[in-house]
Design a protein with these regions (language model features):
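A mid-sequence, solvent-exposed acidic-amphipathic segment
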Residues: 146-154
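N-terminal leader/linker segments that precede catalytic domains of diphosphate-processing enzymes
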Residues: 1-63, 68-127, 144, 156-190
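Acidic, glycine-rich loop-and-strand cores that form catalytic or ligand-binding grooves
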Residues: 131-139, 143-145
């Protein structure tokens, strides 16, 4: 009997309980890794490029749908679902949840003190995207293409050039905490 890629991902994530960070004085945030199974069996992942906004430390960056937990959210899973709906118009039903990954901090310490919890979802088909004004564009990238595109690139961070690990897809640079989250997901697929 064959199992679906989503069943395998769920089983692998279940075997490795996520590490949690409970750091006083930090914001809590959540992101959604939205996977879609393509014909031929490859998995694609949804990314968004944030709109350019003054005062937004992630302005113009490629990332995953998500954001800060709000008072009305019933936990971080609710945050991931709400933010994904707000930013992309994509609803994430309960049965689409495949699991949770380790909590992470951004490595750049001048950013707001935030702990990000990644949630992995699997959808049977590519949903229609209806981006909000928070999102400049979106991108679907196959995991195979992401693997092949991984490299070290030079970027400017807070006025300084530095080399970082990144995925480079169609001219979009995916680095930082997003690179680390996606790399962790790929660890479950090896």
């Amino acid at each position: 009997m064959t199992t679906s890629p989503f069943s395998r991902i769920r089983a692998r994530i279940d075997q490795s309980p996520p590490k949690r960070v409970n750091e006083p004085g930090t914001w809590q945030a959540a992101v959604a890794l939205v996977l879609v199974l393509r014909p031929g069996g490859d998995l694609e992942l949804l990314f968004s490029r944030r709109a350019e906004r003054d005062g937004d430390p992630w302005s113009g960056q490629m990332g995953l749908p998500g954001g800060r937990k709000e008072e009305g959210d019933d936990g971080l899973l609710d945050t991931a679902r709400r933010e994904t709906m707000e930013e992309t118009g994509v609803g994430l039903p309960p049965d689409a949840l495949l699991g949770e990954l380790d909590d992470l901090f951004p490595n750049i310490r001048v950013l707001p003190p935030v702990v990000v919890r990644p949630f992995v979802f699997g959808l049977p088909d590519r949903p229609t995207i209806a981006p909000s004004d928070e999102v400049a564009t979106h991108l679907w990238a196959s995991l195979g293409t992401l693997r092949e595109s991984a490299r070290v690139v030079e970027i400017e961070v807070i006025g300084r050039k530095q080399e970082v690990d990144a995925f480079v897809i169609d001219g979009h640079v995916i680095w930082g905490i997003t690179f680390r989250i996606v790399s962790r997901l790929m660890d479950f697929l090896i």
